[in-house]
Structure formats: C-alpha cells, structure tokens
C-alpha cells in the first residue's frame, strides 16, 4: 500500500472531525474549552442543530393577509354604521331622548363624510356646510315686507314731494300758494324757480334712495333673509356653476352688486318717468 499524501491526510482528518461533531461531540468539546460543563447556560453548538431547521416558514407572506382582509371590511363597517344611524333616526320619535354621553351616529357619519374626498378629487374637510333651506313662509313674509317698503316709498315720494313740487314749478302764481305762509318765505323762493329743478330733483333722489337702501337692510335683518342672495333666481343659477367654468373671479358677488345697483337705478328711472308724465299733464291742462 502506497503512503498517503499530506492533502489526503488532512482530508481524512477533517472528515473524522466532522463525523465526530455530527454525533454530538461538538457541544462536549465546547464545554471543555469554555469550562462550562456544569453550567445551566445553553452551550449547544450550532453544528448539532438539525439541517431541517434551515427552511423557515414564509411568515411574511401570511402577515400581509390580515391587512388586505381588514381593508376589505371597511365598506361593510360603513354600511353597518349607516344602518344603525337609520334605525336611530326612526326610533327618535318613539323612544325617550338619549343620554348626552351616548355618541350620535348621525354626527359621526357627518364627520366621516366631511373628511372624505369630494367628486372633484379634493378633500371636503374645512369646506362650509351647505346652508339649510329657507322656509317658504319666511320667504313669503320677506316678500311682503319688501313690497310694503317699496309701496310706501313710492307713495311718500310721489304724493308728498314730487307731485306738489311739479305743480309748484308749473303753477308758480296759483292761488293755492298764498294760503300757506311758508310759501312766502325767503328759503322757499328757490323752489319756485324752474331752473333749479334738476339740482333739487337730483338731491331729493339721492336722499330718498339712500333712505330706501337703509330701510331695505333693516327688512333683511328683521326677516333673516338676504334680498338677492336668497330670493333672486339668477343668483341661485350662477351659484350652481362650479368655479373655473366661467373665467370671471367671484362671479356671484359681482352679480349681486350689479343687481343691487340695478334695483336702485330702476327706482330712479321710475321717478323720472313719473315726473315726465306729470309735467306733460300739467303743461297741457
């Protein structure tokens, strides 16, 4: 038999050591080296562990499964809350008032809907809540107050100022005026002069329209209804148009301002028409 080479000797020695370690000799040798043969610490060598422990179960795959199931259960939970809210709304008229400590499901749902994104993709959180619809009886009462204000304004202007003033400038020497002592005073003399008609009429219209506007604000404060924002159909139609469709900034506010000026201008046009008609009648009579 030929002698073994150095490489073969080292290989045989390595194989014997490996076989010895696989039979449990690694732990006893480790205890001898470290002097912990009688210690209670775990001194088991990793070489003694079975090779089957190398395969670990795919725990990461199963750990993500509950999250997917949890997301799929969100919609049924919302439906359940809505059903409970509907049952609560039906039972409010039959049951006693609930305790203040009990959470209101309707308030909970409204707060959840507030944080949800709108149809345009932007979150609706922080947006102003839509105004409650105005009672029809309140609208009728507001229209009644507004019509009464306009009627009294026109009556006072026409009967107590415009008609007497137009009669004065067209009949300055009438026998009616000497019966009143104030018509003979010095401050009344400019009213008799027809050349002052434009200045006097413009001053009167400015004062009367200013007073009417203030009284209109008092009517809005009394009825809690804004004259144009809540009653005008054109303003309601413009408010339905989304922002950006029409390239005009604050279209609703500008329309309200324009309608306010038109309301005052229409009163001025009405008074001018009345003056022209009365002047024509007094001139040819």
Swiss-Prot record:
Polar residues composition bias: residue spans: 24-42
Q: Where on the chain is Phosphoserine found, per UniProt?
A: 45
Q: Give me the glycosylation sites of this protein.
A: 173, 196
Compositionally biased residues, Basic residues: 11-20
Its job = Required for the post-translational delivery of tail-anchored (TA) proteins to the endoplasmic reticulum. Together with GET1, acts as a membrane receptor for soluble GET3, which recognizes and selectively binds the transmembrane domain of TA proteins in the cytosol. The GET complex cooperates with the HDEL receptor ERD2 to mediate the ATP-dependent retrieval of resident ER proteins that contain a C-terminal H-D-E-L retention signal from the Golgi to the ER. Involved in DNA replication and DNA damage response and also in cell wall function.
| Protein's name in the database | Golgi to ER traffic protein 2
Region: Disordered; residue ranges are 1-71
Q: InterPro entries annotated for this entry?
A: GET2 (IPR014802), Get2/sif1 (IPR028143)
Annotated Gene Ontology cellular component terms: endoplasmic reticulum membrane; GET complex; Golgi membrane
Membrane topology per record? Multi-pass membrane protein
Composition bias of kind Low complexity appears in 49-60
Gene this chain is encoded by? GET2
TM annotation in the entry: 149-169, 197-216, 264-284
The family line of this record is: Belongs to the GET2 family.
Keywords from the named record: Acetylation, Endoplasmic reticulum, ER-Golgi transport, Glycoprotein, Golgi apparatus, Membrane, Phosphoprotein, Transmembrane, Transmembrane helix, Transport
Q: Which residues carry this modification: N-acetylserine?
A: 2
- UniProt source species: Saccharomyces cerevisiae (strain YJM789) (Baker's yeast)
Q: Where is the composition biased (Basic and acidic residues)?
A: 1-10
Please give the biological process terms from Gene Ontology that the record holds: protein insertion into ER membrane; retrograde vesicle-mediated transport, Golgi to endoplasmic reticulum
Q: Which domain of life is it from?
A: Eukaryota
């Amino acid at each position: 038999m030929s002698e073994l080479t150095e490489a073969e000797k080292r290989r045989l020695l390595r194989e014997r050591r490996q076989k010895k370690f696989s039979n449990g000799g690694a732990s006893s040798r480790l205890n001898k080296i470290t002097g912990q043969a009688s210690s209670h610490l775990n001194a088991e060598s990793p070489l003694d562990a079975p090779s089957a422990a190398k395969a670990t179960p795919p725990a990461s795959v199963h750990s993500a499964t509950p999250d997917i199931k949890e997301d799929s259960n969100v919609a049924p939970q919302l439906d359940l809350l809505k059903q409970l809210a509907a049952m609560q709304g039906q039972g409010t008229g039959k049951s006693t008032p609930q305790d203040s400590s009990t959470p209101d499901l309707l308030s909970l749902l409204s707060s959840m809907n507030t944080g949800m994104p709108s149809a345009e993709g932007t979150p609706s959180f922080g947006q102003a809540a839509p105004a409650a619809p105005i009672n029809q009886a309140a609208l009728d009462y507001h229209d009644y107050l507004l019509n009464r204000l306009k009627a009294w304004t026109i009556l006072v202007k026409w009967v107590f100022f415009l008609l007497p003033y137009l009669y004065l400038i067209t009949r300055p020497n009438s026998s009616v005026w000497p019966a009143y002592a104030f018509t003979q005073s010095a401050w009344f003399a400019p009213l008799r002069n027809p050349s002052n008609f434009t200045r006097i009429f413009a001053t009167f219209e400015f004062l009367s329209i200013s007073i009417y506007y203030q009284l209109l604000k008092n009517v809005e404060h009394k009825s809690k209804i804004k004259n144009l924002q809540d009653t005008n159909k054109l303003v309601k139609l413009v408010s339905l148009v989304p922002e950006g469709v029409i390239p005009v900034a604050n279209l609703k506010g500008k329309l309200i301002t324009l309608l306010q000026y038109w309301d005052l201008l229409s009163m001025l046009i009405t008074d001018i028409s009345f003056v022209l008609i009365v002047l024509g009648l007094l001139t040819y009579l």
